[in-house]
Amino acid sequence: LYLENKLDFVKAFSPYLDAIFCTTGGEYLQKLKQPHLSVAYLPNVGHRNVETLQQFSNTNTDKTFIFCGVVYKEPEREKFLKDLADALEQGHVNYQYYGCFEQPGVYGKAYYKVLSETKMGLNYSRRNDVTLYSSDRIVQLTGNGLLTFSPRIPGFEKLYTEQEVVYFDDQFDLAKKIQFFDQNPEQAEKIAKEGWEKTRKSFNAKRITQFMVEVTFKQPLSENYEWSHEVYA
């Protein structure tokens, strides 16, 4: 929703809708508020038949850390990833990028094969300063049991605590934390397992579908959803 054309696209359909659900919260979500419909934040959805791995207990990985994504020709994003790569090389961390810096992307079955070979991954979206917004990497990584590193997205600790993902302040802080957890596998496993359990428990398809039905039909919320403060009816 932080892209104006996408916001306008959703608004164009809004007269025909009873409810709108978006993976963006805060001021951008509130721009969709209208008297005739409900607007609500929606977390990225995980499913146990899709996110099937338990990497926290996998001892046969050959990569310590991965990032899958593109640069989008954005200088700040490019610098972040280059600085991180330099720091990891200096720290002798076994890492791999996919989809950027002339490295081929991986998708579908090939993507899940990469996840199955990896201990840690980076949740890094195109924008990381938008309330509650993350790409679906967050459930792909945590839901498959990788130790997941994330920037401090506004409000995101309501979804995942510091016991469930590893938050970082910048690329240099991230590099230090990757090295730390590479050298402390028991602590890495503990957080990765907690993150996996949170995704399974809180962001599964059944629970989020239940939330959508309740909001759409203006029913009382049956649970204390972690994101229920972002419902505008």
Where are these regions (language model features)?
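Nucleotide-sugar donor-binding catalytic core of glycosyltransferases
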Residues: Y2-L159, Y167, Q219
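Secondary-structure boundary/capping signal
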Residues: V39, H92-Y95, E164, E186, ...
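Generic anion/oxyanion-binding catalytic loop in active/binding sites
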Residues: Q103, V130, Q163, N184, ...
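Short acidic, glycine/proline-rich loop/turn micro-motifs
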Residues: Y160-T161, I178
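Conserved acidic donor-binding segment of nucleotide-sugar-dependent glycosyltransferases
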Residues: V165-Q171, F181-P185
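C-terminal amphipathic helix plus adjacent low-complexity
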Residues: K177-A233
